[in-house]
Amino acid sequence: MPSERRYYDDSYTTRFSGEVVAVGEHAGKPAVELASTWFYPESGGQLADRGAIGTLALADVQVGDDDRVWHVVEASGPIQASGSFACEIDWARRFDHMQQHTGQHILSAAFERLLDAPTLSSTLGAERSVIEVGLADVDWRTVERVEEAANRVLWEDRALRLHWTDDAHIGEFPLRKPPKVSGRIRVVEVPDWDWSAVTTPVKSRSSRRLSTCWGPNCSRSPYCLSRACITSPFLNCACQTPALSP
């Protein structure tokens, strides 16, 4: 039976007792499976957690083809195949990812609401996050207007509402874009702003501020796309508009 994924119900737990139920490999590296886990695997645009399982450093968390959650560990010898171990999540990394992910949804909704510009792709990274939106042309004042709208939502600290649904009822929610998952689906509502199928959102958005750097950086077309970057919390982004790609 696949691991019970406790992070869906509680994304703020940082320490727990993990029971090892299987030892194996993922992508050729040693890995363990836990009966229940709060470690978040790489999925839904959010990076995997880091931390520790017992004395072993957690290097990665991935979902296998069989839907089992594999915790890739750094081990130089045999791994104990059973037993309970103290587990700890790298909270600084996790919380940063949660902020980045929530901020991306709010900023994407701002582009769509104000400019009718859908998000074509998004990449969340350790240093910065990037969203790519479909716009043929834009000026700095327009970008500032989008940024101001997104920050207004953050400062108002609208209470998130969580909804659980499934494939049969997902159509009842006005999602900004179709979910990438199936089965049991978690939908997060930012009141009067956005509905998204998400992973681990933050409880409060008032401690988050979005800064954008903007410029055409066309990865799929000579001139039709632009990018906006969400920087780390509390940091302003000073950058120049890059030149058009050839």
What are these regions (language model features)?
Residues 1-246:
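A glycine- and charged-residue-rich anion-binding loop/surface
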